[in-house]
Amino acid sequence: VVKLTQDKRPDITKPLEKPEQLGELKAWSYSALKVFEECPYRSYIQKVKKIQEPSSPAADRGTQIHQEAEDYVKGELGELPASLSKFKNDFEQLRDLFAEAKVELEGEWGFDLEWNPCGWMEKSTWARIKLDALVHEDEQSARVIDYKTGKKFGNEIGHSQQCLLYAIATFFRYPHIDFV
């Protein structure tokens, strides 16, 4: 028995046993895959037992900045938030394109085992892709955007893998697209 109760985690009220088989993960996302690769048991606790880790200040900051970015691009904020000031031109352009209906925000895309698009929470959902923004550049091309607020250096490979996955998903969701 592995004891996972903690004084700081009142939601965990009793020890959890680690079974021989950790259980089936029905669907995955890029971040869920990274958790599984790092520690399958952590993935089991999160996805099968449904016990979430407490949020960190860095994660809270990232969530806040993502929300500010979404609200600004949608036109719900008059002024560009200070947290986005380094990318002022990019966010102004994104906002203009959103006003022209050329940008999708916070897309929740589901795919089945054959990479056919399906609902985010359908029974057949095998993969989940959550895009921050997709810009429809023209009839044949799109641009995938995933905001990053954490550590830049040392994460380049992971970030490029995630963008590649999102590009592949874009091709399956929009078969008429030739370039991402």
Predicted regions and their residues:
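Metal-dependent nuclease catalytic cores that hydrolyze phosphodiester bonds in DNA/RNA
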Residues: 1-139
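Mg2+/Mn2+-dependent nuclease catalytic core
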Residues: 109-180
